[in-house]
């Protein structure tokens, strides 16, 4: 049984994004007191938690691609809402306002990820002109 290169890349990407999301959560949890310092610190925390969302979504999506096949795509209801609620809960542990700003930054990041994926992975259909039908001559 041989494993294809794309399967290896998907597995490696899933592992790396999972480890990085755990490292980000542990670091932000460890530095939770720093977020009480100023409003700018809270915004930075929300931005960093949005990276936690993106990395956890990458981990979950790549794991599902390994299980269900390479054509599987993450949908809004199960994957995106699960990762977003997980991120909001983790950010709420650190600071309540971090949870709110992380939702906003995560939605902006999700918008740009969607634009990038449409640009690189969508198949564009070339329109084919249908031959013109011959119409009967109209007599006046």
Curated annotation (Swiss-Prot):
Keywords: Membrane, Transmembrane, Transmembrane helix
Entries under InterPro entries matching the protein: KRTCAP2
Chief location category: membrane
Superkingdom field: Eukaryota
UniProt key word Transmembrane: yes
Residue ranges of the TM segments: 11-31, 40-60, 74-94, 98-118
Similarity section: Belongs to the KRTCAP2 family.
Protein name per the record: Protein KRTCAP2 homolog
Organism: Drosophila pseudoobscura pseudoobscura
